[in-house]
């Protein structure tokens, strides 16, 4: 029985190590063009007065772009076509999976009542009262760094 418990302990420890490696350690790609980026843009859109009989359209101040390096210029061109006065707030040049990172940020920041996300577009959001752009940048960097942090 004691020997069985010892083997089980080794198995659990090995499983913990494997799970940690799988979740946390992602090597850089050999091809920079397929690496992911997360870019937070400030839209700077001007409010549009609704036409008679229409309800006002929700204006979102920020957009999260989850892109691969190879499609960056096309994505940015599309973005600026919709938001000509847009500006880059934050760029995370390398993240193993930009979509996963944004989903994690969105979930945490929404639960903490720091952002209000669009119900229609998964990447559009507004900052809540009392939450600044600087705090947003710090929180996203912190969440990104936590995903890549390795225990000693």
From Swiss-Prot:
Family annotation (Pfam families): DUF3627
Matches recorded under InterPro entries: DUF3627
Domain of life: Viruses
This protein's name: Uncharacterized protein L30
């Amino acid at each position: 029985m004691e020997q069985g418990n010892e083997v089980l302990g080794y198995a659990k420890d090995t499983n913990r190590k494997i799970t940690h490696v799988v979740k946390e350690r992602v090597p850089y790609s050999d091809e920079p063009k397929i690496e992911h980026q997360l870019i937070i843009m400030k839209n700077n859109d001007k409010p549009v007065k609704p036409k008679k009989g229409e309800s006002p359209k929700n204006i979102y101040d920020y957009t999260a772009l989850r892109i691969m390096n190879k499609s960056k210029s096309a994505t940015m061109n599309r973005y600026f076509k919709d938001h000509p006065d847009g500006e880059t707030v934050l760029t995370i040049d390398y993240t193993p999976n930009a979509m996963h990172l944004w989903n994690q940020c969105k979930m945490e920041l929404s639960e903490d009542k720091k952002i209000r996300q669009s119900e229609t577009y998964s990447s559009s959001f507004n900052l809540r009262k009392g939450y600044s752009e600087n705090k947003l940048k710090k929180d996203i960097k912190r969440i990104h760094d936590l995903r890549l942090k390795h225990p000693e």
